């Protein structure tokens, strides 16, 4: 599912809301999560999971084409840990 499909699904479930309003709400949620992560904060959605950032230290990598050693800078990467309820639902016997 892509973002536009998510917006459409939410709009279909809530016919009292305009599609544009649903799109604005979804964008606002993603913007807030992104901003919190950019500030180094953790975003927890109980039962669903938690978004956080982790540091990947600088390292020496290798160019796969030439075999030459390449310095890879340290960077921050997004990380998602699933919540217990989500894991249980995904692994439930149906």
From Swiss-Prot:
Gene3D superfamilies, per the entry: IHF-like DNA-binding proteins
Protein's name in the database: Integration host factor subunit beta
Chain ranges passing through the membrane: none
Lineage: Bacteria, Pseudomonadati, Pseudomonadota, Alphaproteobacteria, Hyphomicrobiales
Role this protein plays: This protein is one of the two subunits of integration host factor, a specific DNA-binding protein that functions in genetic recombination as well as in transcriptional and translational control.
UniProt family annotation: Belongs to the bacterial histone-like protein family.
Xref: InterPro entries: Hist_DNA-bd, Histone-like_DNA-bd_CS, IHF-like_DNA-bd_dom_sf, IHF_beta
GO molecular function: DNA binding; structural constituent of chromatin
PROSITE patterns: HISTONE_LIKE
Gene Ontology process terms (BP): DNA recombination; regulation of DNA-templated transcription; regulation of translation
Complex formation: Heterodimer of an alpha and a beta chain.
Keywords, sorted A to Z: DNA recombination, DNA-binding, Transcription, Transcription regulation, Translation regulation
Gene Ontology annotations for the cellular component aspect, listed alphabetically: chromosome; cytosol
